[in-house]
Swiss-Prot record:
GO terms for cellular component: chloroplast stroma; chloroplast thylakoid membrane. NADP(+) binds at S3, S24, R25. One of its GO terms (biological process) is photosynthesis. May play a key role in regulating the relative amounts of cyclic and non-cyclic electron flow to meet the demands of the plant for ATP and reducing power. The keyword Chloroplast applies. Pathway: Energy metabolism; photosynthesis. It is found in: Plastid, Chloroplast stroma; Plastid, Chloroplast thylakoid membrane. It catalyses: 2 reduced [2Fe-2S]-[ferredoxin] + NADP(+) + H(+) = 2 oxidized [2Fe-2S]-[ferredoxin] + NADPH. Belongs to the ferredoxin--NADP reductase type 1 family. GO terms for molecular function: ferredoxin-NADP+ reductase activity. Its EC number is 1.18.1.2. This is Ferredoxin--NADP reductase, chloroplastic.
């Protein structure tokens, strides 16, 4: 699931690496939240 999400984000082609980092961290946080429930 994570790799699919990463691929989808990559397909959007965000040029700002800081934005990429923020988005990927956000996904990590969501995954952690889901895993904790």
């Amino acid at each position: 699931l994570y790799s699919i999400a990463s691929s989808a984000i990559g397909d959007f082609g965000f040029g700002d690496s800081k934005l990429d980092f923020a988005v990927s961290r956000g996904i990590d946080d969501i995954m952690v939240d889901l895993a904790a429930k």
